[in-house]
Amino acid sequence: MALSIRDIKNIINETISDYTGNCNIISKWKEPLISVASADDLYFEKLKRIISEKHKNPDELLPGAESVITYFLPFAEEIPKSNEAGRDASLIWARAYIETNRLISIINKNIQYELEAKGYNSAAPAATDNFSKKDLISYWSHKHVAWIAGLGKFGLHKMLITEAGSAGRIGSLVVDFKLPVNKRPVQEFCLYYKNGSCKECIKSCVFGALEENSFNRQLCYSILKENAARYNSSADVCGKCTVGVPCAIL
């Protein structure tokens, strides 16, 4: 018998608990969200047109794919709060990025271990660095995959906004068994798309990479690299458009 959604959520929560028990981990997370898409959802094929023809379908990552599991790890409120002031990404925000990416890797490995023991197969794309450094296009966009799975909706800042907000990280796995599929939300979580009342994310992007009708991904990425160099780490982060805004924490 394969894993249920409850089983998967238990693995995620147990992994978080074990991980935060490590004295070197300073980041904290709120209750994770999980959402599932059918591997044959027609929107996966559409991503080849929306994002890139190189974007993978679930069955290109895992032959015989049946379901795509996505989950969101919301940051505790002090993490986005730490990143509101100043031009540079805060150290707390940078560490949360690194520590959450590691956590996602461990969560995926733990889920895969349980699945393998039950005779099932899976594929788990990395939480980050799964994109071309030349054109900055991902072969597996976690946020688009999560949108297909109904985990949230996109905001003006091009980030996924979930029921818990947008300040956090997304992980995903492709599996070869069927799980109950979630419906995509109808309501808008972004106030700009809901009633035109908010453009705070644009104001927060002091670099001018984010505009109402455009996004300069090369400029944005240059800021991410600046912060990575500043902290001498893999924390290619900024997040200014995601913090200090109404949709950061919901």
Q: Which residues does each predicted region cover?
A:
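Catalytic cores of enzyme domains
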Residues: 52, 89-250
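Non-catalytic, usually N-terminal nucleic-acid engagement modules in DNA/RNA processing proteins
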Residues: 1-96
